[in-house]
């Protein structure tokens, strides 16, 4: 996890000076969000985590900002995205479960490496997160699976 966080910091720190400027923050946020972030917005975001007041984020400040952002991500939005992903795999909206057959069907649609996936392999994938042993994944079981991924 720490190496992943360090990679994110390195990606934001374009000039490699060990600090993230408002300009670097702005550029990476625009790339990640797909929309422009103003210099003022980037500076305001940076200021919330700039504990030493130098106008830059060091690694520690950046990690704190990143953690705070993750905690503030609206639970409703996260839940909505999970529901959309679940619904792509679920058999029918009435039953709202992922069966081995619906998992196989969706994985085959996603790409050629899954074209030869056998039903038994799909059962095994579901079994790992099937908390109540009914052979299918409910939305709650899917949420647990995604949290562990």
Swiss-Prot record:
Domain EF-hand: 1-35, 37-72, 77-113, 117-149
Lineage: Eukaryota, Viridiplantae, Streptophyta, Embryophyta, Tracheophyta
Protein's name in the database: Probable calcium-binding protein CML25/26
Residues bound to Ca(2+) 1: 13, 15, 17, 19, 24
Classification via SMART domains: EFh
List of residues binding Ca(2+) 3: 130, 132, 134, 141
Residues holding Ca(2+) 2: 50, 52, 54, 61
Pfam families: EF-hand_7 (PF13499), EF-hand_8 (PF13833)
Main function: Potential calcium sensor.
Gene3D superfamilies noted in UniProt: EF-hand
GO MF annotation: an example: calcium ion binding
Coiled-coil ranges per UniProt: none
Entry keyword set: Calcium, Metal-binding, Repeat
